[in-house]
């Protein structure tokens, strides 16, 4: 393994960390790890993965190995690509990950074509394309492991073994099957015979949707009480106010620009990441005040035009993971959603706003516009939690005989 580049330029990495405000202890860990790598320089090393595995072999301290993995990964990115570390992102090793990289050329070609096909037919959400590509890759890898080098050589047992265990119990979800089907349908244009054959073998699974969890009035009260204290930073208060009063997606919060806020017209304008459609939201007083306080008092001075910036150097726009972390922190401080299985995420605020609008008899197209949906049918899942109107649909059973002690009828 050639460590010449690292040996000649590692001081640039150290100087960058000093100039970016990294702590002395953090810089020391990097310098220590670089020194150990350069001093050892074992002939058996062919990659940074080998370097890490060497330290795994001589240490059983999991805490020590955890920081070594992060540091060695960052050193690799610097050595190979000249990229400096970002302390808000844990670097892993530069190595092919996922089933796709283990597929033969035939299956890789199908996945590649699906991605092109998905964009062509107007699938705009990258996460959907990535998710379906991943499901298809894992499915193809399973077939490949069973000796099926292409779809034409695949039999029904090969396909069903992916979805069912040896006892015939279902081990894959309907959503997984739907994703695999999407990849195969796209592949009809590349391998019509093989894809059509495997499509016929796919099981017909019914997708069962669970009722959407929602924030209770008591939980909302606790969140509002927390917002009235000085426990949260102005940035976090502004983010929670946006989630609570606009139902905006977390990914759209991080993409908000300073110019997105029209203070004169009291509106927020943005292009949604999911639908690529323009959305205009009213700038409510509580939201506007929280944003103004953050921007004028706490927001770091930097060259970025994103509204929300990291609180520590190196300053940069927030990532969506940070929004999720803020929500988790707020729920913890408010002492809500602490039980196992409780849903925690930004979508809870979106659900809450939708249900409240439904309770006020707001028309579905209006709700869809507020939430930025492309179709009014997107609101349908929320109707299952509109208990206010569902109660009106309940039929009285007072005319039917009920055994005493089952329940009381007032």
Language model segments and positions:
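Catalytic-site neighborhood detector that most strongly recognizes the C-terminal catalytic loop/helix
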Residues: 214, 272, 371, 375-396
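C-terminal secondary-structure termini that scaffold catalytic or DNA-interacting sites
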Residues: 398-410
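N-terminal core-binding DNA-recognition domain of tyrosine recombinases/integrases
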Residues: 10-101, 112-128, 133-211, 226
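Conserved tyrosine-mediated DNA breakage-rejoining catalytic core shared by Y-recombinases
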Residues: 246, 255-289
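Basic, Lys/Arg- and aromatic-enriched nucleic-acid-binding interface segment
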Residues: 222-250
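Short, polar N-cap/turn motifs at the start of nucleic acid-interacting alpha helices
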Residues: 260-263, 319, 332, 342, ...
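C-terminal catalytic core of Y-nucleophile DNA break-rejoin enzymes
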Residues: 275-292, 306-328
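Short, basic (Lys/Arg/His-rich) helix/loop patches that form interaction surfaces
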Residues: 281, 325-369
């Amino acid at each position: 393994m050639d460590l010449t580049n690292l040996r000649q330029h590692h001081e640039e990495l150290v100087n960058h960390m000093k100039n970016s405000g990294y702590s002395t202890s953090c810089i020391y860990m990097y310098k220590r790890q670089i020194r150990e790598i350069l001093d050892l320089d074992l002939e058996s090393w062919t990659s940074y993965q080998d370097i890490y595995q060497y330290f795994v072999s001589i240490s059983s301290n999991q805490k020590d190995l955890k920081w070594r993995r992060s540091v060695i990964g960052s050193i690799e990115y610097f050595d190979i690509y000249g990229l400096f570390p970002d302390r808000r992102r844990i670097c892993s090793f530069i190595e092919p990950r996922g089933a796709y990289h283990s597929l033969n050329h035939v299956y890789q070609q199908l996945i590649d074509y699906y991605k092109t096909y998905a964009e062509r037919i107007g699938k705009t959400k990258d996460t959907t394309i990535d998710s379906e590509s991943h499901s298809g890759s894992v499915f193809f890898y399973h077939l490949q492991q069973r000796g099926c080098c292409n779809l034409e050589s695949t039999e029904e047992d090969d396909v069903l073994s992916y979805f069912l265990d040896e006892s015939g119990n279902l081990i894959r979800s309907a959503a997984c099957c739907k994703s695999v089907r999407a990849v195969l349908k796209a592949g009809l244009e590349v391998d019509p015979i093989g894809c059509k054959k495997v499509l016929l073998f796919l099981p017909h699974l019914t997708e069962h949707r669970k009722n959407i969890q929602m924030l209770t009035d008591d939980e909302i009260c606790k969140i509002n009480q927390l917002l009235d204290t000085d426990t949260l930073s102005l940035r976090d208060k502004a983010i929670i106010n946006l989630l609570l009063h606009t139902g905006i997606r977390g990914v759209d919060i991080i993409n908000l620009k300073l110019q997105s806020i029209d203070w004169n017209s009291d509106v927020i304008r943005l292009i949604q990441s999911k639908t690529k459609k323009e959305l205009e939201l009213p700038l409510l007083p509580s939201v506007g005040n929280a944003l103004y306080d953050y921007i004028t008092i706490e927001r770091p001075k930097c060259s970025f035009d994103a509204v929300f910036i990291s609180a520590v150097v190196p300053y940069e726009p927030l990532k969506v993971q940070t929004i999720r972390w803020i929500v988790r922190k707020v729920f913890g401080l408010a002492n809500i959603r602490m039980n196992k299985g409780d849903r925690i995420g930004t979508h809870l605020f979106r659900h809450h706003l939708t249900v409240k609008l439904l309770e006020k008899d707001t028309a579905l197209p209006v709700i869809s516009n507020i939430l930025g949906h492309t179709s009014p049918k997107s609101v349908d899942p929320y109707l299952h939690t509109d208990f206010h109107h569902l109660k009106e649909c309940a039929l009285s059973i007072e005319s039917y005989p009920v055994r005493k002690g089952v329940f009381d009828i007032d």
